[in-house]
């Protein structure tokens, strides 16, 4: 039985058997709805009324609701991927940057005590995203739904002192898009779900800052929503991508994403600058935005540093849109090594040491 690989993000959970040259078998929303008794039933009125409660098990990349996470994983491994209770196999999880030790321990405890897995392994997303493009050293720029992580990696080890997380991601870009659309379409009543879909369809990156300024006169497109409302979309589509290069658009006093990358790498020993900068990997759903990659490389070419960031192209045999699930693909590659070579946490390891064994065997 192939090991399972799970990459649980704030917006989507990616899971499937460890087959590296295929996309994950399951890509499902992480957000869940649970039916809850509203407490209105009584002896006089025995009719029970249920209401939908929306749950987000994962916030900004980290597990926050363990009961919901257990339900989500139960659905994934048993219903979605065909595990049978009493015959569970090995499982590998991707770890976001800055995952607290307590969360790692609680996850390994959940896997062995509730899911009764045969073996467990976890590895950091930055390392796995590099594995997906055939590298063990480089720097990942991961723009997720709830965060941006920039992490230098040397010989398969994340340089945590130099790494940086920004509490900014696709969620904030969606809110920005909603605000911008509201200015030009004041009578519209848009749900965040509508805005998210519009962002995915229309968001674009201008070629450079000068081109962005010229978008004030860009062509206006009309889009008809499912409810019949017609919305006008003009320059707003460019503000989403521009905010990553000019965070002041979001009201933040931060450097743009390329400048952040260069500054982060400059804190690592100078002898490693070249291999980090020349092996830059973009990952996360937002990086698939039209024009983002070319804008990133153009900004990189304008850097004042002696060595400029260069983006790594994924191998041709890898699945399309690799950046959207590169950590999962890297996890599938690693699973082919750690489980056959018995480098993982076994049930015997767990029984002997307890949850803290994860820090000794998974790094």
Swiss-Prot record:
Name the UniProt key words of this record, in alphabetical order: Acetylation, Chromatin regulator, Cytoplasm, Developmental protein, Nucleus
Q: Name one GO cellular component term.
A: nucleus
Q: Provide a GO biological process annotation.
A: chromatin organization
Could you tell me what induces this protein?
A: Before cytokinesis.
Principal location listed in the UniProt entry: nucleus
The record's GO molecular-function terms, alphabetically, read:
structural constituent of cytoskeleton
For whether the record's keyword set contains Acetylation, the answer is: yes
Protein name in UniProt: Actin-related protein 7
What this protein is reported to do is described as:
Essential protein required during embryogenesis and all plant development stages, probably through a chromatin-mediated regulation of gene expression.
Task: State the similarity comment.
Answer: Belongs to the actin family. Plant ARP7 subfamily.
Query: Subcellular location, in the record's words?
Result: Nucleus; Cytoplasm
List the InterPro entries hit by this protein, alphabetically. Actin, ATPase_NBD
Domain of life, per UniProt, equals Eukaryota
Q: Which CDD domains match?
A: ASKHA_NBD_AtARP7-like
Give residues where N-acetylmethionine occurs.
Answer: 1
> Where is it expressed, tissue-wise?
Mostly expressed in flowers, and, to a lower extent, in roots, seedlings, leaves and siliques (at protein level).
